[in-house]
Structures are given as structure tokens and as C-alpha cells.
A protein has these predicted regions:
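A short, structured active-site edge motif that brings together acidic residues
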Residues: 54-57, 110-120, 126-151
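Active-site neighborhood of HAD-like aspartate-dependent phosphohydrolases
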Residues: 2-71
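Metal-dependent phosphoesterase signature
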Residues: 50, 60-97
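Conserved Lys-Pro-Asp/Glu-containing loop-to-beta segment of HAD-superfamily phosphomonoesterases
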Residues: 143-169
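Asp-based, Mg2+/Mn2+-dependent phosphohydrolase catalytic module
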Residues: 8, 139, 162-220
Length: 220
């Protein structure tokens, strides 16, 4: 599901035939600090002191006592519908700065998120997501809500989900891991901050353009 397109700042209008490198950028855990905000909400949900909930979690939040998918979805539903989770997330430092730099340099920013996995609350999730992007000044060309991110057609993915990274890499895509406690087993390329992500993208830029140029010539 692609919601829309927009430009912020001096982003230039690009056609589908341009050689602009498309960055597939995840939101939660990459641009938005999902786990710190969810930790606050979980402390309220469980009626416990936040210090009892470790900030070092794995995917699924079992460290907080979440035992199955139903419990995870119940907490997530409460967070989205009663605490405006996606509207109140703090931005990960550097996300706006470096995405703007990349946008100004001609990279196409494609935000890709799987926030619609809980039924019946899609409208709230979409609205909160758009408002958060606007509030934090995150530049993007496309906003896509999808589970299977390899179908988006990005050249470089920035992702924190270990499952998504393994899937993307197994299919031949360049997936940069945004490191956190959920993905400690994922190897390079990875970085734990946006300055590191920016450097990796630029280290791969020439190779990506070399790969795409012959294809563009065949199309012309």
C-alpha cells in the first residue's frame, strides 16, 4: 500500500527513468525510537515501574513478559489507539539531518513500514505516521505500508528487523542493518547511528550506479 508522495526542501522532481538511487528506509527502530516509547507504554500497561523493563529487548519483547503474538498485539493495539504510539515516538538522532542530506544529494527516499499488521486500526496507524513524518521534517518521495519489503524495488534498504534483513540479503538486495539489541547477530554492513549509515551508503553508491547504468542504456 503506497499512501503518497511528497518533497521537502530542494528535492528535485525525478522521473521513473532517472538513475537516482532509491533508499528503502524503515521507520520503527531506524527513524523513530520505537522501543523507548513502547517501554514507557508497556510499563503503564503492566502497571509496573519502568525500571523493571529492560531497554535491551529482542524482537517480540519477551524480556518484558510478552509470551505470544496475541499479547504483543494487545499491547500494540493499546499503544496505537489509546496512547497515539506512532504520533508520540521520539526521532532517532540524525535521521532528519542525514535523510535531508541524502535527499539533497539526489537519493530518492522511500519510507517502507509494516505498521498495518493489526487489523481494524489501519486508519489510525496511517494518520499518525503521516503526522509524525510532517512534525519531524523527514523528507520522503514515497510512503509505503508493506510486509514484503523486497517488492518495493529499492536499491539500498535500511532496516533493523533481523527477519527482514536476512530475507532481503538472501534475495540479493543490499540491506544495511541499523544496529540495536534486536539484531545483534546480524553481520555487516551495519551501523548504530545515522552518521555511520550515511557513510555506508556513500561507500556503496558508485557500485550501485555502475550496476544500474547498463540497464538504463538498454531501456533507452
Amino acid at each position: 500500500m503506497t499512501v503518497g508522495r511528497r518533497k521537502l526542501g530542494p528535492m528535485t522532481v525525478q522521473s521513473e527513468s532517472d538513475l537516482s538511487i532509491v533508499l528503502g528506509v524503515d521507520l520503527d527502530g531506524v527513524c523513530a525510537d520505537f522501543y523507548s516509547r513502547m517501554r514507557e507504554i508497556a510499563a503503564e500497561w503492566f502497571e509496573t515501574n519502568i525500571d523493571r523493563l529492560t531497554p535491551q529487548v529482542s524482537y517480540g519483547l519477551s524480556e518484558w513478559g510478552i509470551k505470544n503474538q496475541d499479547q504483543y498485539e494487545s499491547l500494540h493495539r493499546f499503544a496505537v489507539t489509546q496512547r497515539d504510539l506512532f504520533r508520540t515516538l521520539r526521532m532517532i538522532p540524525g535521521a532528519r539531518k542525514y535523510l535531508r542530506k541524502l535527499s539533497d544529494e539526489g537519493f530518492r527516499i522511500r519510507i517502507i513500514t509494516h505498521r498495518l499488521f493489526i487489523q481494524f486500526f489501519h486508519a489510525a496507524a496511517v494518520q499518525q505516521t503521516i503526522e509524525w513524518l510532517d512534525k519531524n521534517g523527514i523528507p520522503y518521495w514515497d510512503l509505503c505500508f508493506m510486509k514484503d519489503k523486497d517488492q518495493i524495488g529499492a536499491d539500498i534498504y535500511i532496516e533493523d528487523s533481523p527477519e527482514n534483513i536476512v530475507r532481503l540479503r538472501s534475495r540479493g538486495y543490499l540491506a544495511i542493518c541499523f544496529g540495536n539489541s534486536t539484531n545483534t547477530t546480524i553481520g555487516q554492513p551495519r551501523a548504530t547511528n545515522w552518521s555511520g549509515i550515511y557513510r555506508i551508503i556513500h561507500s556503496k553508491k558508485d557500485h550501485m550506479l555502475d550496476v544500474r547504468t547498463p540497464l538504463a542504456k538498454r531501456r533507452s
